[in-house]
Regions:
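Short, charged recognition helix plus adjacent turn
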Residues: 69-104
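Short, basic-rich loop-to-helix N-cap that marks the start of a DNA-contacting helix
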Residues: 46-59
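K/E-rich alpha-helical interaction surfaces of small helical-bundle regulatory domains
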Residues: 59-73
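Residue-level detection of the helix-turn-helix DNA-binding "recognition helix"
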Residues: 33, 44-46, 73
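DNA-binding alpha-helical recognition surfaces that contact promoter or target DNA
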Residues: 41, 55, 70
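A short, Lys/Arg-rich alpha-helix, primarily the initiator
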Residues: 1-23, 70
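Short alpha-helical DNA-recognition segment
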Residues: 22-41
Length: 104
C-alpha cells in the first residue's frame, strides 16, 4: 500500500540522522565529502536525493541506500500523482498510424 503523502527523504535524514548526532550541516557535509550547499538543499527538501548522496549517507551514518532511495521513489510517485490532472495525454487505442520519420 502506498502512502498518499510520503515524506521527503531530506527531511527524514535531517531529523533522524543529522540532528540526533548533533552535527551542523557544515560538519555533516564535510563528513560526506559534499558541499554545505548541496547537503543543505537536500535537508531542506529543495532537491531530490541522488543515489550518490544516498550511498555517502549509508557509508557515513548507516541508513541503507536502498531504503533511502525507496523513500525518494515514493515521494516522487506521490508528487506526480498529485500533478497528473495537469498532464494532457490521450489514451492510445491502437488505431492511429504512426508516421516514420523521413530521412533528411
Amino acid at each position: 500500500m502506498s502512502m498518499k503523502n510520503p515524506p521527503h527523504p531530506g527531511g527524514v535524514i535531517a531529523r533522524q540522522v543529522i540532528e540526533p548526532l548533533g552535527l551542523s550541516v557544515t560538519d555533516a557535509a564535510g563528513i560526506l565529502g559534499v558541499t554545505r550547499q548541496a547537503l543543505s538543499l537536500l535537508l531542506n527538501e529543495r532537491t531530490d536525493l541522488s543515489s550518490g548522496m544516498a550511498l555517502r549517507i549509508e557509508k557515513a551514518f548507516g541508513p541503507k541506500m536502498d531504503h533511502l532511495m525507496r523513500m525518494q521513489l515514493a515521494f516522487d510517485l506521490a508528487r506526480q500523482r498529485q500533478r497528473e490532472g495537469r498532464i494532457r495525454v490521450k489514451r492510445y487505442s491502437g488505431q492511429a498510424k504512426i508516421e516514420e520519420p523521413q530521412p533528411a
